[in-house]
């Protein structure tokens, strides 16, 4: 099914992840958001290799909402440059994919 996206957002704190995920679901920008604790992240930031425990938000949405999600996350997130990435769905449970489309 065309237009369905999987998204990936990282947060420094569980409370922030819940705030962002709840906002996106309430605004019907995403059909579903899953929060995964204790992700070990290693990244380059301002010339230094940095290690951090992060919280991961993953979920499902439609292409029509991508820019609204990015804008919302940038407003709500404490990171200067938050990670907000989208991937296309190739296939999946058709009933679940239809539910995503109806939910957003």
Regions found by a protein language model. Name each.
Residues 1-104:
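Positively charged, small/polar-rich N-terminal and surface patches that mediate targeting and assembly
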């Amino acid at each position: 099914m065309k237009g369905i996206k999987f998204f990936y957002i990282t947060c420094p704190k569980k409370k922030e992840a819940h705030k962002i995920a709840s906002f996106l679901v309430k605004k019907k920008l995403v059909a579903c958001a899953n929060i995964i604790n204790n992700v070990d992240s290693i990244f380059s930031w301002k010339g230094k290799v940095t290690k951090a425990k992060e919280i991961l938000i993953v979920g499902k949405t439609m292409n029509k909402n991508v820019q609204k999600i990015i804008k919302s996350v940038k407003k709500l997130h404490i990171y200067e440059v938050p990670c907000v990435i989208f991937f296309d769905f190739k296939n999946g449970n058709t009933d679940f994919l239809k539910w995503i489309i109806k939910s957003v």
